Amino acid sequence: TDLTDLLKLKNYIDKIENKKFKSFMLIAFADAIKPVSLMERQSLKPYISKKYPKQTKTVRESFEYSFNAHYSAISGMSSYKTGVNGIKWIGFDASKFTRPDVAIDIAITSPPYINALDYTRCVKIEGALCGCINNAIAKDMRKVQIGHENRKNTIINKMVEDLFEPYFEHIKVYDIGRAKTCLAYFNDMYNNLSCVYNVLRMGGEYHIIIGDNTIKKVKIPTHEIIAAMATKIGFKWFGYYKYK
């Protein structure tokens, strides 16, 4: 069966002694899991779609595709940056980090959507099969997951509260908990904007890939609110590209 083949492949990977090679193979393995299963690959929805039946791949087909895709990506990156010191971690909480000794030219991110989707749950199967996540680790991950409902009782910046107040008042009519979660999301994004602003060089740019949402029948112009917060911090909004 596919599950048996996945476990056999994982067993072979576990026997690799070189840590870098093993890490790369585990990444390729993790990315190969969903195409083999009935889970959706291009969606983070934690359920199986009955409307659009999925054509699955064999373990070999999926792993070979994943391996080649990641090898191509890492080769491309290596052509721009070489050496063991090519990557420098500057924090593990996107809403709370500071590095006065680090200066960057450009930051690019695609933050979570405001709908509080449990991203940790969506990657839990891959993490479990790779042996790098359990319930305790998942719980800790959710504590620092921007936009997660666990952060809805955090202390909110007054400026953020004022910006989101019109939407907050409409959402709370339907669900006060969701309204607080949305408010906490923008508070997290405000903190992230502040952190990134402080590590950007003069003239540096921050590119954010984000989508607007409708929460409890209330349309939220997420990109406009983030832009307004960024402007108050000191950023200059040079435009946006919108597509449907």
Each predicted region: which residue ranges?
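Acceptor-substrate binding/catalytic loop of class I
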Residues: 123, 178-187, 209-224
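SAM-dependent methyltransferase catalytic-core segment centered on the flexible catalytic loop
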Residues: 114-195
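Class I S-adenosyl-L-methionine
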Residues: 229, 233-244
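Short glycine-centered segments of the SAM/dcSAM-binding site in methyltransferase folds
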Residues: 24, 204-205
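Short alpha-helix
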Residues: 191-194, 221-233
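Flexible loop/turn segments at secondary-structure boundaries
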Residues: 96-97, 115-117, 214-218, 244
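SAM-dependent nucleic-acid methyltransferase catalytic core
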Residues: 2-109, 114-121
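Helix-to-beta-strand junctions that scaffold the AdoMet/dcAdoMet cofactor pocket
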Residues: 200-202
